[in-house]
């Protein structure tokens, strides 16, 4: 494998997987734990029980953040331990609406965050979120 190295093989990695968040739709893990840090993949607003995607950015934000919280919790960490999030949004005009939902899940001191407008997301959802947390 081109990316393999002695360093990578010497670091303990643990794959994190949960049914309380949407499964991977490609060759990647839902999250990886390494040295007591949890790195999630992007989480989209798919209801993991039904596969349905809610209408509207607020409902999608609720589902995406709920999925992210479940993934972090099922890693053995907790939402309060999230130190960085990245939010990918389809429409920057939705930034304020997403912030209102974000504040329901994250409290001060808020995690560091990047927000990026993108042309398109998987399944044509309106946002995707990823996080880094410590354990």
Task: Locate each region found by the language model.
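Short, small-residue-biased leader/transition segments that mark boundaries at the very start
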Residues: 1-4
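Residue-level detector of intrinsically disordered terminal segments
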Residues: 7-11
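Short, polar/acidic, helix-capping and beta-turn segments at strand->helix junctions
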Residues: 12-135
